Amino acid sequence: DRVVDGTDRFAQYAIAAAVQAVDACGMDELDAERTAVVIGTSCGGTETIADSQRSLDLEGPTGVDRKLQIKAWTNMAAGQIALRWKLHGPLLTVTTACASSIDAIGTAARMIERGDCDVAIAGGCEASRTQVTMIAAGIYGMLSPQPDPYKACRPFNTERFGIMGGEGAGVIILERADLAKARGAKIHGYLRGYASLSDGFHPSSSNPDGSW
């Protein structure tokens, strides 16, 4: 399969999630010029880069994946989704660490509000659990040492220990409310607002006073 051969796992997750979302939304077809794709990812194709570095070390230049560039670029999750449905609307990738997915959804909603598009395929994906990234996260002190999975990842708890590595994708379909109602869509919810900011405190820690 050319799509699988030409994509990193992070993009494959996004494509699979987008297919499920589009199938569930009930549209007969997407308007190619009025549909946007906005996908968030923090790391992109780290697995492809790690595998190619390993092959380079063992085999030399001939071992490097010839498609490394198009597989590793963070924009290729959104790009592959647009390619699948031959879309010509706005195409964006959002990379804001742990906020990438929600920022992608919020950005897509604002694009609909501005009239840039009527529909948006929006969400996020990640597949960065390579040996080197997990070791680095552990050395940096990011990973939770808690063995109980129900207590290991509690980011908003005062007794939090750290984060856990995970991967996957989540994609939703945003649509102008009047259009969704007119076609009798099953509406799961309304996005009433969105905000994005930085606390300007630390590269990886939130300000403990919670002011931002």
PLM regions: where:
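Short, high-confidence coil segments that cap the C-terminus of an alpha-helix
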Residues: 116-120
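Condensing-enzyme catalytic core mediating Claisen C-C bond formation in acyl metabolism
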Residues: 148-212
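Short loop segments at secondary-structure junctions
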Residues: 26, 115, 175-179
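Short conserved active-site loop signatures built around small residues
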Residues: 101
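A glycine- and small-aliphatic-rich helix-loop capping segment at beta-alpha/alpha-beta transitions
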Residues: 47-62, 111-114, 134-147, 208-211
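Phosphate/pyrophosphate-binding betaalpha-module
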Residues: 124-159
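Conserved beta-ketoacyl condensing-enzyme motif
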Residues: 1-96, 125-134
